Amino acid sequence: VSIVSKVCAYTNHTILAEALEKWPIGFLEKAVPQLMPIIRELDNRVRAKVSDESTYIIKDGLVHMAHMDIHYGYSVNGVAYLHTEILKNSELNNFYKLYPEKFNNKTNGITFRRWLMSCNPELSAMITDLIGDGWKKDANELEKLGNFVNDDAVLDRLLAVKAGKKADLKNYLKMKQGFDIDENSIYDIQVKRLHEYKRQQMNALYVIHKYFEIKEGKKPATPITVFFGAKAAPAYIIAKDIIHLILCLQQIINNDPEVSPYLKVFMVENYNVTMAEKMIPACDISEQISLASKEASGTGNMKFMLNGALTLGTMDGANVEIAELVGNENIFTFGEDSHPVIDRYARGDYNSRSYYEKDSELKRAVDFIVSDTVKSVGCSENLERLYNELLNKDWFMTFPDFEDYIATREKAYAAYTDRKDWAKKALINIEKAGYFSPDRTIEEYNQDIWKL
């Protein structure tokens, strides 16, 4: 135990209960019988010194792996500032009271070699032309791009690079999946694991809202292409129902001659790293719309930022740090922050139907899920199950944020029409992305935890 406690450190990557391993004692006694006496002894030592039952390793017939990590590791860290604060003040508060000295933050990073140099050589070349190639070894040198935010020639070149990547994605998806994409449209992209907390369902409800607006004659100033890319866990039924809805919307909207010149929806097949390398450099608006308090950090938000996309997001995960870095005028934030969300969960009084009844735009969008129009191209069972889930549960609180989401998304689309100012915002995002270098992350881990 003495050796383990000096060697092992715990990094928490999620607060979702489903991802914090808890193994039935009976299963472990069959699978690893040689380990159970050790686990019981570790638990007994905790019980001898701690009175708070919620922190015990063996509880309710389950072995709580995270509890073991915290008691016997020498460090506990979250992976974004907000995430770590939530661990300390909410999710792991009982442990924080026991071991405040163990808790620290290490904000995630992304590899620039993959997510800029490899996937966007045109932007990499532009950056090198402007500030030299020192940024490839020291990402903080991207700050030098701040000298060019008012340089029209640089902004024009940045727009040209983005236009080229948008054309590349258009051609790639035409070849691979037969999609007919308007490269002059706004590329609004949400690509990530399909999970209710990431709220692809809220994005889909906005698409329905926009569909109705266009049908009523309210056409956007710039055409919009909404891209989804995601996979659902094999047994995650509601996630698959959300994919089903998106595919229904793709079929309805893209084949409607009144709507498709102004709005199209594409769910890319088999979303993976190869696809991400095509989509991220082409993105104009990066959808990072998780329910505040649920995304530990996120790294897609960093990849999009690095490639000059603007974030449309909640104040969750690393979005909080992105907003601090780029300034409120260079990011589009909306929705409740983590405090009212955590309080509402604690009270257990969230009623999605009350929001549905008082917001006519929300009600119309939700009802469309089970309309004859959607059922004519989809499966009633999937659609009704999703409809009932939203109306009677909506565990990740899509409805409270919906009105602000619409308003902020419209604000982002309006900002896009000023191309020079948009390019300035994009360049500022690239300039500030150096903080999310993995070199900085790893250096902090080494200084504070590993001490190699």
List each language-model region with its residue ranges:
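A conserved ligand/cofactor-binding region detector
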Residues: V1-L452
